[in-house]
Structures are given as structure tokens and as C-alpha cells.
Amino acid sequence: MNDQQFEQSDIRSQKANMMNSLTSRSIKRTLPIWLDNSFKSLLIVVMVFSISLARAAEPIIQEPTFSNEVVRVLQEKCQRCHQPGGIGPMPLETYEQARAWAPRIKENVRRRIMPPWHLDPTIGIQEYKNDFSLSEEQIQILVAWADNGAPEGDPADLPLPAEWPNWLEWELEPDLGTPDMVFESGPIAVRAEGGDFWPSIDVEWPALEKPRYLKAAEIRNTIKGRGALHHNNIRLDLEEGPSGRVVGAGAGKRWDYFGEDTGILFDVGPGVVNFGAHYFPIGVEFEDNIEVAFWFHPEDDPPETVASVEIHHLIDQFDPGQPRARDILIPPHGTQTMYRTWVLDEPVMLNSYRGHMHLHGIAMSIEVIWPGRVRDYYGPGANRRDVIASINNYNHNWQTSFVFADDARPILPAGTAIVMRTHFDNTENNPLSIDPDQWVVFGGRSVDAMSHFHVSVTYLEKDEYDSLLLTRLNQLSKRK
């Protein structure tokens, strides 16, 4: 076994141990009342944005086989991670590989632990560009296959093997071509022992000839580094023009693709690209290197929609009157709910969002409270407030950006209040709560608590808002 194979095997072993610890214990985490069934808002004000509610039950295939139905589900939703050298703890490409894990596959998909898409499928908008969750039919296929003894079926039914990019290459390159710009952090010394640490590295951003619009960005690092890097955020700080976080990477996520009609404005600069990383020692001393690649829209074909860099909302820094400068103070065997409200000064279209918590975080949500004139316009039947997204099964080990489908992006008028809630669980019901006997306070370590929301919006002029709203209303009327 060569060094690369050993490193990949070691990372898969770590992931397998983590998976075993997560799935061998009962997960009965205490959800707050605002995510309980009795308080689920179904977005009655559907005229303001497109919505698809809970997926309807689909016909169940009674006797699925690996060669026919199962492998096609695995290729579509699982093998991107579960392949040799991938971050999944085991490959799931062949019958022999999948058969050995059939009971675990059944349990994880039934409980929606895998694939790691942590949205509640019964609340809010369900249309996303990057949705890799399983449909109800796909879940039933995998569950029925395991219940029937995981039959192989006829190998003649097998599709061609899926082809995946090498994990040491850019995942987006086969679709988008060679990156337009690539930046490197340079060597980062990762120690074998000790506590977490957070290197912050600035690399010069050269002045551009003209502003460009970002179409996609991707982060990659070394194989060993993937086992020790919790997350890395790339920030662009320009002397003039928009600055902020552009892309983040964590377990299971290394790129953001904004689409053919959406882009983030990169002004000419100059400035710096900041690599903000979070490492935790894994018992091996090594040298890491982080790279970020940028793909731009063509200079002569700018996107229709200009998205903002990520707007960083600190939910854990809402009320300075709390006992700490940051509010998080979770008692032993207790829970805590926090929120932050963002009142819009101008109309916006919400493009994407991602939440960030640590081990004690279990749920997050985004709710909108409509301004009075919107309620008056749509009449007394309109809801006053609606939950547009509920991350009801948050998992600290996955850092996911949820990118709305183009026709599902919420269009919100000025005066709308966006309420971002987070919930922490420091009880024995949370398998990631390492020691429920201890108080938990704010901190950067994974064993401390933190609560952030990152959102990307497009700011709209009044005429743009009116035009988009009219277009959306016409689209909805055609669906009826």
C-alpha cells in the first residue's frame, strides 16, 4: 500500500468511526416548539415566491435489485462521496460493497441521515439547484432492497459505471473548463497534537482590467488535510467594491455554483484573498496547502442577476445584555434557542443560505414576517409570517449551502423582517453533546457553541421588484 492509499484508508477509517458513533446511538434530539408539527407554516402567501411542499408519496417498487434500481440510486445520489478515495467511509460502487452495508444504508436513508441534506421536507421551499436528497421513491427502493435480503438481480441490467473526477482535481472542471484564476495559501503546518487552531492567510488579489462576475468557486486541499480541516472560508477584501465571503468548504462540500444567470460582482481591486481555515489535530504532523479556483461569466455576457457576497449574521451576538459578550450559555442537561431579526430596508431576492453551528446545534430556521401593506394587498387570508426554510436535522460534520432554484428564490419587499432562529441541545438526547454535565458557552472550538447564518441576496430597485413579482405571479397562475 503506497502513502496515498494509506492516507485515503486512514481518512475513510476516521469517517467510518464517526458514522458508527452517530448511527449506533438513538438520536432523539429535543426540537423547539417552532419546529414542532403543531407550528409548521405551509407558506400560505404563495404569490410572493414559488414553493413546493412535502413530496407526495410515490409508487413503491416491491422487489428492487442492486443491478436494476439500487445501483442507479447510488450513482445519482451517493457515489460522488462513496467512491475509492472519496470522503465516504466506504465505496458503494459494486454489489459486494453495497451488500455488506445494506442494513446501515437502510437505517441511514430511512432516518434521512444520508445523504446529508438536512432540510425538513415538509416545511418551506423545497426547490434547490444543489438538492441531492433522496426522493420518497428512492428511499423506499433502498429500504425494500435491504428488507428483502439485498438481492443482486441480473448483472446484465447494470448501467455503465459512473465516472467521477479525481478527488485531487477540480470537480467543476469537466463542466466549466479550466479555472480563470487559482490562488494558493502556501504551506500550512498542521501539528499532530493539541487544540484546534485557525490560520488566516492573505494572498494578493491583482487589479483586474474590468469588473468580472463570478459563476463558480471551488476549494481543495491535500488528502491528509481533508481529515484535519473542519472548514475553510474564502473571503475577498478589495480596496474598492464589494468585499466579503465568497465560498466555503467543509465535509462533503467544496464548491459553489451560482448558475448561468447569476453571478457575484468582483470589482477591479486590488485587494487580498483571505484563507480562513479551522483545523483540529488528528495525531499526524503534516503540511497542508489550500487552493481556491474561480470561474467567471464571459466578459461580453454578464449574468441577469447580481448576487451579493455572503452576508454574515451572528445569531450568537444578538443581545449584549446577556451574561457574556456573546449570548450562548447552555446549562447542563439543558437547551437554548436564539434568534436574530433582519429588517429589510429595500426589496431583495434571496439566492442562498447556509447555517453554521457546532456540536450542540441541532436546528435552524428562516422565517419571514410580512410588512402590513403586503398582508393588506393579499387580503385577510394571507399569513402574517411564514417559515421558508427549516434545517431540522443540523449536523456539525456537514457544511452545506442551500441554493434556491431560479424560480423558487424568495422575493421579499422592503419592510420584511427575516427571523433567523437556532436551537442548541446539551442533553443526553444529542449524541454529539460530549459531556452534558458541563455548561456550554460561546467559542471557536467544536466543543464550544456558535451560531451563524450566511445569506446571499440580490438587492432590487422598486421597478425590478414589481417586474419580478409580476413574472412570478404569471408563472404561478400557469401552474394552477
What are these regions (language model features)?
Residues R55-W205, E209-R212, A216, I223, ...:
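Aromatic- and Gly/Pro-enriched helix-to-coil junctions and flexible linker segments
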Residues S38-S50:
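Bacterial N-terminal signal peptides
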